[in-house]
Each structure stands twice: as structure tokens, then as C-alpha cells.
Regions:
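Amphipathic alpha-helical repeat scaffolds of TPR domains
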Residues: 9-39, 43, 53, 76-101, ...
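Acidic, Ser/Thr- and Gly/Pro-rich intrinsically disordered linkers and low-complexity segments
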Residues: 59-83
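Terminal, low-structured helical/coil segments at or just beyond the last alpha-helical repeat
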Residues: 202-205, 209-238
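Structural motif corresponding to the intra-repeat A-B loop/turn of tetratricopeptide repeats
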Residues: 99, 104, 142, 175-177, ...
Length: 238
């Protein structure tokens, strides 16, 4: 038992040493921690990713040795409030998401990391939700639209009031890969689930599009949805 505790403590010490190395690197110029225009990934950026991956692997190893998945329990037992395992995992995911906008190979890596986390750890509810939506977004951005749609639609089926899921799909078909028919499907799905979207971008785009092509039937349909949205939106605090 004592040997096991010593091994776990040594892994925690290794994690904190890696975290200190990351903090040291961030004092230098990296794409993520600098301000201004995005840069190409440099050696500092790539080293940060590798350090965070080592940290994640060690956290998972601790979880396996403890035979628990809940990271909050690991935090309370082994980490200080200012540098918890949860915080380091969340920061790693944020970094991958940022770098993925520069290099799609990093987005592919983010898919692997989220799958690794989902298989081995239980994060807080908000981050679990964020990861499920982000995973679908990663698949979409790397060209696997079918997988992305399957994941996000399954998520919406189980959580029909989670606005970020609709927003994610809306962004796909408004900006990433414009498709007016698929955008209409997103709005139809929100209407079907009686979900009030935070923004009116989708409604506005559809009304203007159908008006421009002379499709009176669809223009009236989405104008009605839009008018109802405006009435309901005024009564809700987000």
C-alpha cells in the first residue's frame, strides 16, 4: 500500500514538474500565449503540446491505479487548488482547439485526446458537454461530416436544450461549409424541440435567402419562426 502511495505521489510530482516547464515556455513567444495575428506552430508550441500529453497520460495512470474515473476525486486527493488535474486537462483541450485553427493535424490529435479522456476519465458536467460538442466539430473540420452529424444529432436527442450543439451545427452550414438546406434543418430541429436559440443568425439568413430567390413559401415559413423567436426571446434570460 505504501509503495502504491509513493508511486502516485511521484507521478503527481512529475505532473507538477511538467506544468512548471510549460509555464517556463510560455514566457517565450508561442502562438497560443502571444497576442496579435496567429502564427505557424513553432517548436515551443509543439513542446507545450507534448508536455500536456504527458500530463494527461500521468493523470490517467493515477486514475487507473486508484480505480476511479472522476477527476474531481483525484483533484481533492492529490492536487492543490491552484493547479488541479481538471484545470490542466481543460487548458490542454483549449490549446488543442486553438492550434487546430492553425494546423488541421492538431485537430486530428484533439479527436484522439477527447476520445482518450472519454474512455478513461469523468470530468465535470460542463466540460463533458463541451467535449462532446467539440468532438463532433473536430470530425466536421477534418472532413468526416457523417460522423460529426451522427455525434451532434445524438447529443441533441439526449440534450435537446443545449444551445451550443445547435450553434455548432449552425456554424457548419453558415460559415465552414455553407449549405442553406442543412441550415434549414438545424432551425427546423430547434423548432421541433421547442428550443429557443440564443442568436437569430440562422433565422435571419434563411429569411433573406428565400426572399432573394423568390421562394415565398419558405420565406413565410421561416419569417413566422423568426417572429415567434423574437417574442419568446424577449421573455427569457440567458
Amino acid at each position: 500500500m505504501k509503495v502504491g502511495i509513493i508511486m502516485k505521489n511521484s507521478m503527481v510530482e512529475k505532473i507538477m514538474e511538467l506544468n512548471r516547464k510549460i509555464e517556463s515556455i510560455t514566457m517565450k513567444t508561442t502562438s497560443y500565449f502571444s497576442f496579435g495575428e496567429k502564427q505557424n506552430l513553432n517548436n515551443y508550441d509543439r513542446q507545450i503540446i507534448e508536455y500536456y500529453q504527458e500530463i494527461l497520460n500521468l493523470i490517467i495512470e493515477i486514475a487507473k491505479r486508484e480505480e476511479i474515473k472522476n477527476v474531481e476525486i483525484i483533484d481533492n486527493k492529490y492536487f492543490e487548488v491552484v493547479n488541479t488535474a481538471s484545470m490542466m486537462i481543460e487548458e490542454y483541450l483549449s490549446i488543442l482547439q486553438f492550434y487546430g485553427n492553425i494546423d488541421r493535424n492538431i485537430t486530428k490529435r484533439e479527436i484522439d485526446v477527447i476520445n482518450q479522456i472519454q474512455e478513461n476519465l469523468k470530468l465535470d458536467d460542463d466540460l463533458e458537454i463541451k467535449n462532446k460538442i467539440e468532438l463532433a466539430d473536430c470530425y466536421f473540420k477534418t472532413g468526416n461530416e457523417n460522423k460529426a452529424r451522427k455525434l451532434i444529432l445524438e447529443f441533441i436527442k439526449n440534450s435537446p436544450d443545449e444551445d451550443e450543439a445547435y450553434m455548432c451545427m449552425q456554424n457548419w452550414y453558415m460559415y465552414d461549409r455553407p449549405d442553406i438546406n442543412k441550415l434549414a434543418e438545424v432551425i427546423d430541429l430547434a423548432e421541433e424541440n421547442k428550443h429557443i436559440l440564443i442568436t437569430d443568425f440562422g433565422y435571419d439568413r434563411l429569411v433573406k435567402f428565400y426572399d432573394s430567390v423568390g421562394d415565398i413559401k419558405n420565406r413565410e415559413k421561416y419569417q413566422k419562426f423568426y417572429d415567434n423567436w423574437k417574442k419568446k426571446r424577449e421573455t427569457i434570460e440567458f
